[in-house]
């Protein structure tokens, strides 16, 4: 029996069958995820096809279950960034003029300078409580350390966000008040 479009049958090491979905857009092969059944994988493929063939210019905030029934939100962001800006980035980044947004979820958005694009396009950001980190060579690296904020620093005492937005990590928005490095 022939697979549905965009769907490939695969097998786990323990013998369980699962279905991978992918699409090719602008000569780029894009994985859409793994699914338990062929219909869900095909639905994700159909969602992605509808997005890239649509005349609409979608933005990340336009995500809804009526547009994407099976496609993950993070994959939505990657696809519309590729469609609108011409650059495919596997992490959920949407490029803006002189900065970019990194989407941890639809309502959890981080802002960075374009200078950090290369780093965050290759590192997935994770959140545990208020702790934001990337996995780097088996370690959890706090993203605040990239901006001179020490792990023991206290907000509004040792550093502050100039515009008050704790999710805005643009260099101009971070002011180090106490650059204490330890006793020398």
What are these regions (language model features)?
Residues 17-25, 30, 184:
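Positively charged, aromatic-enriched nucleic acid-contacting surfaces
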Residues 14, 39-42:
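A broad, structure-centric signal for solvent-exposed, well-ordered loop/edge residues
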Residues 21, 41-49, 184:
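An aromatic-rich alpha-helical recognition segment common to small helix-rich domains
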Residues 53-56:
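Short acidic/polar inter-strand loop motif in beta-rich domains
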Residues 1-16, 50, 61-183:
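Basic K/R-rich, polyanion-interacting modules in nucleoproteins and related proteins
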Residues 28-39:
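A short, exposed loop/beta-hairpin motif centered on an aromatic-Gly-Thr core
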């Amino acid at each position: 029996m022939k697979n549905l479009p965009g769907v490939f049958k695969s097998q786990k090491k323990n013998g369980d069958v699962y279905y991978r979905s992918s699409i090719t857009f602008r000569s780029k092969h894009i994985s859409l995820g793994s699914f338990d059944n062929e219909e869900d994988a095909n639905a994700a493929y159909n969602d992605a096809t509808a997005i890239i063939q649509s005349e609409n210019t979608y933005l990340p905030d336009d995500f809804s279950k009526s547009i994407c029934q099976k496609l993950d939100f993070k994959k939505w962001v990657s696809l519309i960034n590729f469609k609108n800006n011409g650059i495919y980035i596997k992490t959920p980044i949407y490029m803006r003029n002189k900065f970019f947004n990194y989407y941890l979820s639809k309502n959890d958005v981080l802002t960075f300078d374009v200078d950090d694009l290369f780093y965050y396009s290759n590192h997935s950001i994770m959140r545990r409580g208020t702790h934001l980190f990337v996995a780097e060579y088996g370690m959890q690296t706090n993203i605040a350390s990239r901006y001179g904020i020490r792990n023991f620093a206290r907000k509004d005492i040792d550093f502050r966000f100039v515009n008050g937005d704790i999710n805005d990590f643009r260099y101009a928005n971070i002011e180090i008040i106490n650059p204490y490095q330890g006793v020398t």
